[in-house]
UniProtKB/Swiss-Prot annotation:
KW Ligase (keyword) present: yes
Residues annotated for ATP binding in this entry: 7-20, 96, 152, 175
Gene, per the UniProt record: tmcAL
Family (UniProt): Belongs to the TmcAL family.
GO cellular component: cytoplasm
Protein name per Swiss-Prot or TrEMBL: tRNA(Met) cytidine acetate ligase
Organism domain of life: Bacteria
Keywords of this entry: ATP-binding, Cytoplasm, Ligase, Nucleotide-binding, RNA-binding, tRNA processing, tRNA-binding
Keyword tRNA-binding attributed: yes
Gene Ontology biological process: tRNA modification
Function: Catalyzes the formation of N(4)-acetylcytidine (ac(4)C) at the wobble position of elongator tRNA(Met), using acetate and ATP as substrates. First activates an acetate ion to form acetyladenylate (Ac-AMP) and then transfers the acetyl group to tRNA to form ac(4)C34.
The organism of origin for this protein: Streptococcus agalactiae serotype V (strain ATCC BAA-611 / 2603 V/R)
Catalysed reactions, semicolon-separated: cytidine(34) in elongator tRNA(Met) + acetate + ATP = N(4)-acetylcytidine(34) in elongator tRNA(Met) + AMP + diphosphate
Length: 369
């Protein structure tokens, strides 16, 4: 049977995600971000809730991406997630895209010209942002022209690179409805951005999500809920360059601005430059918030939930993969668990995220109904 992998954040889970799951074939394995997102922000609802949303709408198995895979630039995010999916026996990678490119051809180009492409990337000016460098590389070697600020393009190409290195087939699906960052109230296929922005509009949320009651009744957070803690971390840390990926230039910029801003968004605006994108600054602020340092990625894979079909698939791979279904006296990934503890500080109603939690079980897969 085909085992299809999907890399996701589900922040929150919406009708577009449900459509993607409906298009995927076979056993559907989701590698999902935990409580902090790829672009450096807290999830609007916790990872257990988002996992349940996915399992109730077509997913068979949801595993958690470690913190230092989740909160990364597109290439590292995709590479880490796809390598985990490959270990779980995934042979097909499904992802949404706003423009259907010949991803198979692009993957072949990368396999055949990987060293040249990576060398080209390293030669690009440091004045360019990472997305701009990637755009130049793909334009040079694959003839692709696109906006370097379009996240789905950047992620789609990152998935292509990662899948080609793991021998995984690609299954791109045309994105339905609103664009990735659209905040418009497109009711049937609203974007996650729009649903977060208009979360207080119950009618809109109910139209845009298949799990609206679960979402609306769950404790929610935004970046600003952590601003006081972030400010404390910045002002009391003796050397911010000890934090993961924070260099002296960024440390000085953050330190000099934190006294004069009242929101996370203001701080991001003050610190970001053409070279350091807002997404990168948000990631760095997330690392500071968590007090993250460079750490090895855990070998074990943490399971958030499964259906009966997903549980059977886990049994078929457990001899070759170290699976964690309950975190107790032994840690899984100390950095991810620290991130979970910080995440809980954003809302007193957020349930325990780590200790003793067991996977959510959805008895019947939607595809079996």
């Amino acid at each position: 049977m085909t085992v299809t992998g999907i890399v996701a954040e589900f922040n929150p889970f919406h009708n577009g995600h449900k459509y993607l799951l409906e298009q995927a074939q076979g056993i559907k394995v989701i590698a999902m971000s935990g409580n902090f997102m790829q672009r450096g922000e807290p999830a609007i609802v916790d990872k257990w809730t988002r996992s349940q949303m996915a399992l109730e709408n077509g997913a068979d198995l949801v595993i958690e991406l470690p913190f230092l895979v989740s909160v990364q630039s597109a290439d590292y995010f995709a590479s880490g997630a796809v390598s985990i999916l490959a270990r779980l026996g995934v042979d097909n990678l499904c992802f949404g895209t706003e423009e259907m490119l010949d991803y198979a051809r692009i993957g072949d180009i990368y396999v055949n010209k990987k060293e040249e492409m990576e060398a080209f990337l390293k030669k690009q000016s440091d004045s360019l942002s990472y997305p701009q460098k990637m755009q130049a590389m793909w334009q040079e070697f694959a003839g692709i022209t696109f906006s370097g600020q379009t996240p789905n393009h950047i992620l789609g190409l990152a998935y292509t690179k990662a899948a080609s290195q793991n021998g995984i087939r690609l299954n791109p699906i045309q994105r339905q409805g609103a664009g990735y960052h659209s905040s418009e109230k497109t009711e049937i296929f609203a974007s996650a951005t729009s649903l977060r922005k208009h979360q207080s509009d119950r009618f809109f949320v109910e139209k845009g999500m298949p799990n609206s009651d679960l979402f609306l009744n769950s404790p929610q957070v935004v970046w600003q809920d952590y601003f006081s803690l972030l400010k404390y971390q910045i002002m009391t840390h003796s050397d911010l360059t000890q934090i993961y990926q924070v260099n002296e230039e960024i440390a000085n910029r953050i330190k000099s601005q934190i006294r004069y801003v009242e929101t996370v968004d203001e701080l991001v605006d003050k610190v970001a430059t053409k070279r350091y994108t807002k997404a990168r600054i948000r990631r760095l602020l997330t690392y500071i918030l968590i007090n993250a340092v460079e750490s090895p990625i855990p070998n074990a894979i943490h399971v958030l939930g499964f259906t009966q079909k997903g549980q059977q698939h886990l049994k078929s791979v457990k001899k070759s993969v170290d699976i964690v279904t309950r975190i107790g006296s032994q840690t899984w990934d100390s950095l991810t668990q620290r991130a979970d503890s910080v995440y809980q500080m954003g809302n007193a109603n957020i349930a325990e995220q780590t200790w003793g939690r067991i996977p959510f079980y959805q008895p019947v897969s939607q595809s079996d109904l």
